[in-house]
Amino acid sequence: MITIHDRYVNNELLQFISRPQYDTSCSMSSLTAIINYLYSDQIGIKTTKEWAEEIETHSPDINMAPGNQTVLEWFRMVVDKYNLKGNCGYFIKDEDVDWDNNPEVISKLKQAVRCRNQALIYHMSNHYNIIAGYFENSQNPDDAYNNKAKLERWIVLGEHSDFNPIPKIIQKLIMKLPSKIMSEDAKNLLMERAGSPPIWCRRWGSIRNDLISTPNHCIMSFRRE
């Protein structure tokens, strides 16, 4: 049997990404994907506005910064409202993780991503994303198919907005750069890689550092029982 680097993308979960989202509804839109992925066979497809109205919370077109606990509580309310079975909680939160045992953390994350009855949301930079897969590759081109080589790990994220981490003022400066410095296509490529793709990746090392250094950032788990 041929063994190569471990790579996986949950295409079924990606099908439920609620895109586009309302301007400031990343928390609710990410949860919409989770609800539909886990329970659409029981309750049908729900839009963000539909489930928000049915649990009597605020509309997604209203600007609100709900926080992690609120997102978890919304899920519990949806489960109760539709008489479903499920649970949720923090999957990775810095103070609860043995970061010295990185292989165990990675193994646990992979198992969760591959589990049909579970889905994960990553809270980063005041933004929420679906974790839809992972990708491993060697650090040396001669080891491209050597599964014992030292690895670079990426986490595949499902994006429901045009979230762009580049500040607006910097975006404007980039687009004003003359073509002798950066072509129009290069500027568009930079903006698109930074902002709008429905699927993108972030290095596991960067996510790990983010979760360690930023107290409010975390990975949340939502599971169907």
Name each model-derived stretch:
Residues 35, 43-47, 87-88, 131-133, ...:
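Intrinsically disordered, low-complexity regions enriched in proline, serine, glycine
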Residues 15, 50-53, 80, 107, ...:
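Polar/charged alpha-helical tracts
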